[in-house]
Amino acid sequence: MDKKIKLIPGICDTKNRHYLPEKLLDGKTTVNENGNNSQVYPGNLKEYRAVLADDIEDVWYEYVPDSYDPGKKTPLVVSMHGGLMTGWGQAVYTSWTLVADREGFIVVFPNAASKRMWMMECDWEKVIETLGQISGDVPLLHKPENHVEDYHDVKKTVKLIEKMKEKYNIDAGRIYMQGMSMGNAMTGQFARYMGSILAGAAGSGCPTNSKLLFDNRHEVINQSGPLDIWQSRLELDKVPPHYREGDHETIRYNLEYWNRVNGCDALPQIGIRDEYNFAFYKGSQGNNVLMDVKNRDHGQTFDDAELVWDYLFSGCYKDESGRLHHSEPRKKWCVDEVNFAVAKDCRKAWVNNGIMELHKPCFFWEKIKYHGLNGNAIVRGSYAYIPVSSLAEIFHMRLKTEENGRVAYLCGAPQIGKIISEEVEEIQFAEGNIACIVNNSVESMYAEAVMKENELCVSLEWFARRFLKLSVSECDGVVYATDHPSRISWHMADLIRTYLT
């Protein structure tokens, strides 16, 4: 039986405005911000110092849970802190120590060697050009020299992993890395160049500049081969200004990079749980997961480590030859078995994690108020409209039309996946009418039925909520519906739109 996890109560310092307040070291204090949330300083977290490489003394923190069994092979997680933070800071800002308590694995949290900033490959000229856009309290990145394999932070991390293998009974096929912000960029760098010693890598915030992922022919730059990847994104986050590329663009390139390395050619399986948006890619060589969290700022969610472990790390390992294998993870991927989505001006729809053609592109129609406004108008709502004929196909209903399509009937019970509305026998729509006739009774929709390019169209949101009782949300012109509470996020909307365009 798994050891039970227990949270230790703490006193939240609501007045804190620092990245990493030293007060957290007292073992009593917590801080909560919309990018990072902490736990009380873990009792088993121990600091170590030693020369690992280049005659430089490095600092790291080890967490060995009481549940660790030295008699059996044990996974190792290496967790990399964000810029301006420390190894102990990463330990309190994640749930890795709590997950380790239950699972019995070991976690190591290294410090960056200098300025609390990792040595990273970067476009140095762009960094210098962008100095004026960077806050004065943020130190300049290290200027990269020589090859990535020669960076001290990379070399010392390799040596630290070797040291952990010597000190503890580590399973060499189950070594994983995760990082936050600059630690995510460091994890990505390590995964691309030294990832052969990892089975999986994950990170939150700060995706990698695409110029470091692809060469001038758009071929991937990779020395490590496949490994399972988890990419956590935050809806309100922004990529660093020296990237000189958009947020959506950077995230798409990061997805494309690992999809190509891991042989992920099929559509993702999408699942949205409240504010957590997931896209699961299964590849011939490895898996790739995107998580985008709605209404979240730069950093990492406190349960990010739990999610990474449950859905990814717990189900991947490498054999002695270095080949990646998969077993059942602790939790089954949270894929929506029932879902559909449409996007403004797109002629395709996402239906149950597949794609189908609409008869006409989706468009948005506004509901307005103008009485008593002296000729002005107020928009009271904007809704995604698709052809009634497409509703018939998506929801497996029979379509009848009259008067050159200006009147339409949907007959039979609407159904999507296992959800069926037995109450419905017939729905009649007519151009210009907000009313529809449901089983010979009058009902109002959100807005009137509209003829568009000889197709009668109505609100998809209204139809999904009224007849299938689905949860419907909209973001940036993309509407998503499923059978449980969900809120589509900005980056998930962009991802779906790319497949519907």
Annotate the PLM regions.
Residues 57, 72-76, 102-108, 171-176, ...:
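Loop/turn elements at helix/coil->beta-strand transitions in domains of secreted/extracellular proteins
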Residues 318-501:
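Primary recognition of N-terminal secretory signal peptides and signal-anchoring hydrophobic helices
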Residues 78-80, 204, 293:
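Alpha/beta-hydrolase
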Residues 51-61, 72-173:
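Serine-hydrolase catalytic machinery in alpha/beta-hydrolase-like enzymes
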Residues 165-225:
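Primarily recognizes the serine-hydrolase "nucleophile elbow" in alpha/beta-hydrolase
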Residues 199-285:
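The feature captures the conserved acid-bearing segment of alpha/beta-hydrolase catalytic domains
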Residues 1-76, 149, 153, 178-194, ...:
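A domain-start/cap signature at the N-terminus of enzymes
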